[in-house]
Each structure stands twice: as C-alpha cells, then as structure tokens.
Amino acid sequence: MSLIDPRAIIDPSARLAADVQVGPWSIVGAEVEIGEGTVIGPHVVLKGPTKIGKHNRIYQFSSVGEDTPDLKYKGEPTRLVIGDHNVIREGVTIHRGTVQDRAETTIGDHNLIMAYAHIGHDSVIGNHCILVNNTALAGHVHVDDWAILSGYTLVHQYCRIGAHSFSGMGSAIGKDVPAYVTVFGNPAEARSMNFEGMRRRGFSSEAIHALRRAYKVVYRQGHTVEEALAELAESAAQFPEVAVFRDSIQSATRGITR
C-alpha cells in the first residue's frame, strides 16, 4: 500500500524516504527532501530547496519553504533546513532565506510550532522551542534552545530570544531577550526569570539562586549594562548558567529588553 495519497502532487526531483506519508491534495515541490518517518498531512505545500529531517509531522494548510516576501529577494537559490522530531501544526508559514544574510532558514530538533505561527526568512530556531499559536517572527530572528513564545508574540527582525526565556501572551519584542528572562507586554518588558521552566528541566537550586541574584544585578540595582556585566563576571566563572545569561547580554545587538 502506498503511503502517498494518489491525490497528492510530488515533483519528480523530490526525494522522499520510503516510509514518508503524504496526505491528499498536498504538493511536494522540486528540490524537497524528506527524511524517514515524517508525516505530511493534507493540503500542505512544500517548496524547495527544502530539507526536512526524520520523524517530523506537518499538519494541514501549512506552507513550508515558500519564497520570502522580502523586497530584496530576486529569486536567488536559498534554502530551508528542518531537523528531526518537530511538530508543525495547522496553517504555519515558514519562508526560506535570503542571500543578503545566510541564504537559509534553519529549524532544529524537537520543536513545537503551533497553529498559524510564522517563521520569517533567515531565522534560526534551536531545539526544544515552543512557538504558540499566531506567534510571528520577522526575518533574521534567532530563537535559542528551550525558549517559549506564548500566543500572539511578535518579534522584530534581527532580535535574539535567549535560551530558556519565556514571553507572555501578546508580547511585542523589539530588543534582544536575555537567556532565562520572562518578558511581557507591548512593548515587552522584563518581568522576572523563567524559574518554573528551570525547575522542570532539572536546574539545581544553587544555579537558580545564582541566576536570581544575577537578574537583580541587571534589572533591580540601577546599573548600566557595562556595570552589570562587570559585577556578574565572578558569578559567571562559578556557574555556567550565569555565564550563559551574561553572554546573552554581552552579545546583544539590539540592546536588551529591560
């Protein structure tokens, strides 16, 4: 029994593993590669060059690998690369890159991208991230591992969302979000750290306490960023988690959410 519905359209140049399932009315375009165990639902459009790894599931009405609407894009060959064990729910849109940046949009492993979310061109999504319904990432956005963006979160182009961070529903993010920080509002403001997420992921009580102190240094003591970074140096040398927090602030290119 074929795992590809006869009503699906598969370009001859597409490469599908033997056990890939494709539902009715879906279109798998030229230069699309799909790894083993992946399930493509009905009414999905996949456009290449796109590489999709193993054991992913893409639900109905999603558009994956479409050209970017960036006005600079003139049809140059660009890519979308998706890793393994991702779930892409209904109506998600993901665009390929532009040659002005990386020429590639990249999604890692074990991510949940919920209904009607959008991932813009040249964005990079790490591993174990959750993009809740209607989250929209502009172009060139980086989302680090274990970040959670709640429903209707909007992220400005070139922003970086730090590892283990959390955004509240409807947040409008225009600056970098440091690792572990919880933000909320329009415009988004730092509210606390994602301590619940840390506990669920097995962070030690010592590391959480050190991060709590580090947060106060940056956000509660009136320091400039440079002063806060200097004060965090000793703690960062002792706790890798604080080093990640400090590095995410130091490397911010758009300023940090305060």
Swiss-Prot record:
Q: Which Gene Ontology molecular-function terms are recorded? A: acyl-[acyl-carrier-protein]-UDP-N-acetylglucosamine O-acyltransferase activity
InterPro entries assigned: Acetyltransf_C, Acetyltransf_C_sf, Hexapep, Hexapep_transf_CS, Lipid_A_LpxA, Trimer_LpxA-like_sf
Q: Signal: is it a keyword of this entry? A: no
Where in or outside the cell it occurs: the entry states:
Cytoplasm
PANTHER family in alphabetical order:
ACYL-[ACYL-CARRIER-PROTEIN]--UDP-N-ACETYLGLUCOSAMINE O-ACYLTRANSFERASE, ACYL-[ACYL-CARRIER-PROTEIN]--UDP-N-ACETYLGLUCOSAMINE O-ACYLTRANSFERASE, MITOCHONDRIAL-RELATED
The Swiss-Prot or TrEMBL record describes its family as follows: Belongs to the transferase hexapeptide repeat family. LpxA subfamily.
NCBIfam families referenced in this protein's UniProt entry, alphabetically:
lipid_A_lpxA (TIGR01852), PRK05289.1 (NF003657)
Q: What is this protein called?
A: Acyl-[acyl-carrier-protein]--UDP-N-acetylglucosamine O-acyltransferase
